[in-house]
């Protein structure tokens, strides 16, 4: 089952548009899922706004979700930013703390940590720091 946060208009040249679900409709999607067939795991991908991030975090807590995977899709393959500036901090504060597994790529790791990833060792350092928080 899926809950759709946004639709994108994109191709190999870039993203030309993003149409987000409203927080109310997105919450209705999550409620429909969690009150029917309870998911064994939750995978979170692109979430563009802080309002939708808050909606997800609230639902995960309310429904006591387990096995949460956060793939913080923040930049498209073509380099277009997919998350609003004010949403990245909320993602760190509300979703990263709930996730069992976080799978950022290098550009996403740099956005989330504010540091430059220049080696495999630096990735391990960021992983260790995140685990300590």
What is each model feature region?
Residues 1-70, 74-77, 81:
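Conserved N-terminal subdomain of the carbohydrate kinase-like
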Residues 44, 49-125:
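Conserved beta-alpha-beta core of the PfkB/ribokinase-like small-molecule kinase fold
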Residues 126-131:
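Conserved small/polar residues in nucleotide/adenosyl-binding loops
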């Amino acid at each position: 089952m899926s809950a759709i946060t946004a639709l994108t208009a994109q191709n190999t040249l870039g993203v030309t548009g993003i149409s987000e679900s409203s927080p109310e409709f997105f919450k209705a999607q999550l409620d429909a899922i969690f009150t029917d067939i309870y998911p064994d795991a939750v995978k979170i991908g692109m979430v563009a706004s802080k309002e939708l991030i808050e909606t997800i975090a609230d639902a995960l807590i309310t429904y006591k979700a387990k096995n949460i995977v956060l793939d913080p899709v923040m930049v498209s393959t073509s380099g277009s930013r997919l998350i609003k500036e004010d949403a990245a901090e909320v993602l760190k504060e509300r979703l990263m703390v709930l996730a069992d597994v976080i799978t950022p790529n290098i550009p996403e790791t740099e956005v989330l940590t504010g540091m430059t990833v220049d080696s495999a060792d630096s990735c391990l350092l960021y992983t260790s720091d995140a685990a300590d928080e």
